[in-house]
């Protein structure tokens, strides 16, 4: 995949546009538009977003097409958008319509792929990616690469989503680094905030545990 990722994925926007163009002239209620947006339009990019991080600009352009369709805009005649798109993406119980925020949905799908790598270590999927992209560390420590595939770098975006909420559950503590890993039982900040002790940069939580107690 070349540097211009937006051009590589532009076919998704074109498919969405063609779908919406076919419906614009029809007299649809808001209930009808809601069903079409959720069941058809927002389903179009789902497969691709499961494996690749789409450019934010492309997501915004697709959402712009959907917004105009939702408010009944035809051609160049602009119509007032009475509610912000962010509000429409909220659950209905919170005053929204339950539409998908495409960028957030993309991140969630990629996080699912990262979760597969973490929990299916006997799979061919894991073995191939492990050997090629993180042979000497875990996926938690793996780094994005300018020479790596876009699929791999996309999975790392999903990994970063998991990192925001992931916590180590301490057993023996041999694999948990004191200073870098999230292991403290705190909801606000699970990482150690004090300065790193010189000479103990790679200290493990197991070093803090007295085996006799």
Predicted regions and their residues:
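A helix-boundary/hinge signal
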Residues: 1-213
């Amino acid at each position: 995949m070349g540097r211009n990722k937006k051009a590589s994925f532009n076919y998704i926007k074109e498919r969405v546009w063609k779908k919406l163009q076919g419906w614009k002239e029809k007299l649809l209620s808001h209930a009808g538009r809601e069903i079409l947006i959720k069941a058809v339009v927002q389903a179009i990019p789902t497969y691709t977003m499961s494996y690749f991080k789409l450019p934010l600009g492309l997501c915004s352009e697709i959402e712009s097409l959907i917004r105009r369709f939702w408010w009944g805009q035809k051609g160049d005649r602009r119509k007032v958008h009475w509610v912000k798109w962010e509000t429409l993406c909220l659950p209905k119980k919170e005053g929204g319509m339950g539409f998908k925020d495409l960028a957030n949905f993309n991140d969630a799908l990629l996080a699912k792929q990262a979760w597969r790598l973490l929990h299916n270590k006997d799979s061919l999927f894991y073995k191939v990616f492990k050997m090629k992209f993180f042979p000497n560390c875990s996926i938690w420590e793996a780094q994005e690469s300018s020479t790596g595939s876009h699929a791999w770098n996309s999975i790392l975006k999903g990994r970063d989503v998991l990192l925001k909420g992931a916590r180590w559950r301490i057993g023996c503590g041999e694999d948990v680094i004191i200073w870098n890993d999230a292991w403290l039982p705190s909801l606000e900040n699970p990482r150690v905030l004090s300065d790193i002790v010189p000479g103990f940069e790679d200290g493990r939580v197991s070093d803090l545990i007295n085996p006799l107690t």
